[in-house]
């Protein structure tokens, strides 16, 4: 996966949408007006911590802006592993026009790659990282994907029925990468995965396994989902699992 990653220090991107390469006059502004406004929400307090990372997936150079100030604005090993798997198995997974929701989308790499591969993507995360997430998604998908990804707030375990009603929110895939680490919301994370899974939904979860809590979560995941280990990356300690909800 090293060939997909290059890190370079960059100044904060602060130009207008056209200066930053977002769009030309042919784009319908009203379609993306609120999205463009939302990119202003993310402003690192320490500009020295600001970086760009460059990736190559789906035949396109992808530029991700990050800040090390927030766990959710950094690309982690599970994300690159999941992107590689999606790219290598696009036809097998039937990603063209597939409906995908990503939990904990972070800096947006997985959602961007999924969109470039033809999927209809909903990228979700906590409110404090949505501005950066939206920025990266627009920067890398506008005018070059069939379906412009949607960015939405999702707090694990909260207001799920109200925000994502099962009657209208049906997904072929729920994606998650490096969402399991040392935090206190693992039960809510699992409950969210279960809630978003309907008959036919496949969960693809990639994670670097570091702590005992990671394996404890895996045990609970296996209780809720029929689980298959799809890939293991020894150099990064990342495991990629496929889960299909067990129905009583």
Swiss-Prot record:
Organs and tissues of expression: Specifically expressed in skeletal muscle.
Principal location: nucleus
GO cellular component terms attached to this protein's record: cytoplasm; nucleus; protein-containing complex
Positions of S-adenosyl-L-methionine binding: 76, 104-106, 125, 156
Subcellular location: Nucleus; Cytoplasm
Enzyme class at the top of the EC tree: transferase
Keywords on record: Cytoplasm, Methyltransferase, Nucleus, S-adenosyl-L-methionine, Transferase
Keyword Metal-binding in record: no
Reactions mediated catalytically: L-lysyl-[protein] + S-adenosyl-L-methionine = N(6)-methyl-L-lysyl-[protein] + S-adenosyl-L-homocysteine + H(+); N(6)-methyl-L-lysyl-[protein] + S-adenosyl-L-methionine = N(6),N(6)-dimethyl-L-lysyl-[protein] + S-adenosyl-L-homocysteine + H(+); N(6),N(6)-dimethyl-L-lysyl-[protein] + S-adenosyl-L-methionine = N(6),N(6),N(6)-trimethyl-L-lysyl-[protein] + S-adenosyl-L-homocysteine + H(+)
Sample GO molecular function, one term: protein-lysine N-methyltransferase activity
Single biological process term from Gene Ontology: regulation of release of sequestered calcium ion into cytosol by sarcoplasmic reticulum
EC number: 2.1.1.-
Protein family: Belongs to the methyltransferase superfamily. METTL21 family.
Quaternary structure (record): Interacts with members of the heat shock protein 70 families; these proteins may possibly be methylation substrates for the enzyme.
Protein name stated in the entry: Protein-lysine methyltransferase METTL21C
Gene from which the chain derives: Mettl21c
């Amino acid at each position: 996966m090293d060939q997909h990653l290059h890190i370079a220090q960059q100044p904060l991107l602060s130009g207008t949408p056209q200066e930053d390469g977002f769009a030309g006059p042919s784009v319908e502004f009203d379609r993306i007006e609120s999205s463009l406004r939302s990119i202003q929400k993310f402003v690192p307090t320490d500009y020295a911590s600001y970086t760009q990372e460059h990736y190559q997936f789906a035949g396109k150079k992808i530029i991700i802006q990050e800040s090390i100030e927030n766990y959710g604005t950094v690309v982690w090993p599970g994300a690159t592993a999941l992107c590689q798997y999606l790219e290598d198995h696009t036809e097998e997974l039937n990603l063209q026009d597939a409906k995908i929701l990503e939990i904990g989308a972070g800096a947006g790499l997985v959602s961007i790659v999924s969109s470039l591969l033809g999927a209809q993507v909903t990228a979700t995360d906590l409110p404090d990282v949505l501005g950066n997430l939206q920025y990266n998604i627009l920067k890398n998908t506008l005018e070059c994907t069939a379906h412009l990804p949607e960015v939405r707030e999702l707090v694990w375990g909260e207001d799920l029925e109200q925000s994502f009603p099962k009657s209208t929110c049906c997904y072929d895939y729920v994606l998650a990468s490096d969402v399991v680490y040392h935090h206190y919301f693992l039960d809510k994370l699992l409950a969210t995965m279960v809630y978003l899974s309907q008959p036919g939904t496949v969960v693809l979860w990639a994670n670097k396994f570091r702590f005992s809590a990671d394996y404890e979560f895996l045990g609970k995941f296996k209780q809720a989902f029929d689980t298959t280990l799809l890939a293991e990356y020894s150099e990064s300690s990342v495991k990629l699992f496929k889960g299909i909800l067990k129905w009583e």
